[in-house]
Amino acid sequence: TTGSCAAAAAIAAFRKLKNPILEDFNRNIHTVLPSGETIEIPCQSVSGTFSDEKIEVSATVIKDGGDDPDVTSGLPIVTTLTLNLAEAKQANNAPVQTPETWEFVFHGGPGVGTVTLPGLGLEVGGPAINATPRQMIIDNLRNCIRYYYRYLPNAPIHVTISVPGGEEVAARTFNPRLGVVGGIS
C-alpha cells in the first residue's frame, strides 16, 4: 500500500538520521503492518542534510502494486523526517520524550492531497494522510526510536509525505469528489 511504502521510507530515513555518515544501507526495509505481519519493502534512495539548525532526511520507495495495482503503482513515495533543533526542549523545561511519548507532526508534501470537506476522519485543511497509515508510520518509527532516543534531540519529529506525480494521478481517483484536492490520499 502507499502507507506501507511511506512507513518503509520513514524507517530508512530514520536509519540515516541516526547515522549521518551512512553511505550504503540495507535497501530491504523490514516494515511492520497494522496486522503485526512484517514485510520487506525495497528502498530506492536515502539522502540527508545536517546543520546546526535542523536535521532533514528523506527516503524514497517506489510503490509496487503487486497483484492488485492501482493508479499509484510505480509512483515514488517519499518520506522526509525533520528535526528542527530550535524546537528541542531543554531538559530543565520539559521532560525527555520516550519512544511511547515521542511527538510526531505530519505534513503533506507535493502530490499529497489536502482535505477540504468533513467526514473523512481527518482535519479539514490538513494533509490527506489517513489514520491507519499515520499509525503504521508512528509505530514503525517508535520501534526505531526505542534504541536511539537517548541520543536524539528532544524535539518533535516532523514527518512529510510526498508523492511526485500524485497530483496528476489523483485526477483519476474519487479523491476530488470526496474533498481531497491537490494530490492523493
What do these predicted regions represent?
Residues 1-182:
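Generic N-terminal targeting/processing segments that precede catalytic cores or assembly contacts
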Residues 185:
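Alpha-helical metal-binding/catalytic segments enriched in His/Glu/Asp
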